[in-house]
Structures are given as C-alpha cells and as structure tokens.
Amino acid sequence: MIPTPDNEKLSAFYIRGPKHSIKGNLTILMFHGNAGNIGHRVPIAKRLVQSMGCNVFMLEYRGYGLSTGSPDETGLMIDAQTAYDYLRKRAETRDHDIVIYGQSLGGAVAVQLAAKNQDDTKLIGLVLENTFLSMRKLIPS
C-alpha cells in the first residue's frame, strides 16, 4: 500500500519486464477506467510487458479495490501524483523513462498528471484510450 499526503492508502501492482530487455528502463504508469479495478486490467498490462519488454505500474484509486477512501476529482489527482512521485523516488524506477497510460476515466487523470509534470524529462509519453477530458461528469467533487 502506498500512502498519500492526505492519509489514504493506495493499492498498486508492479509488473517487471524481462530482465535484459532493451526497454527495461521504461515504466508505463497505468490508470484504469471507472468500472472495475486494476485486477481487471492485468491482461492489458501483461500484453504491454510481453510486446514491449517494459515495466507496468498499475495504481488503484482511492475507493476502488483495496484502496482506502472515497473517489472524487481532487482525490484522484492526489492519487495520480502520489503514484508518479513514488516511481520517481523508488530506487528501482527513479531513473526510468515514464509513459502515462489512461483508459476512460484514467485518461482524464493521465492528461492532468502529464500537464502537471510536463517539465520532467523522464516523462516521455502519454497514451489515451477511450477517454474524455472532464472527470466531473463521472466523479463529482
């Protein structure tokens, strides 16, 4: 569990890529949609690891799965930044390039996180799948 600055605890799952992969220094930070939890996205994460040889870090927002709290727009952005900071500070991943990937609700989270961290030279990409730009329509503040 990863603690947030506002004292929630977030569940996460890290899938390491193959040991000597040329993409071993790349981690995809994956944000899921509103329906389900990270467990439902494991097949996608595994496919990314197998096809690209990268690592995948999947975060479960507050109020989803095993994470504590209740979801709202502010909280989801705290969760996203917490995950990003965790990857940037963790010994195993601090030197990795990061691609942020968001599905549906996770796309709105991903866009805001990428905008907030756009000056980080290790943030090298943003992937959006079936997304929208406003979380308020789905998760009220």
Residue ranges and their predicted role:
Residues 93-104:
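Alpha/beta-hydrolase fold nucleophile elbow
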Residues 53-54, 93-94, 121:
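A generic structural motif
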Residues 36, 63, 107, 133-134:
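Active-site micro-motifs of SAM-dependent methyltransferase domains
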Residues 23-26, 95-97, 122:
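Short coil/turn segments at beta-strand junctions that form active-site/ligand-binding loops
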Residues 87, 91:
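Hydrophobic pocket-lining residues that define ligand/cofactor binding sites across diverse proteins
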Residues 57, 101, 127:
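Conserved Rossmann-like nucleotide-binding pocket used by diverse enzymes
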Residues 109-141:
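Hydrolase active-site cap/lid region
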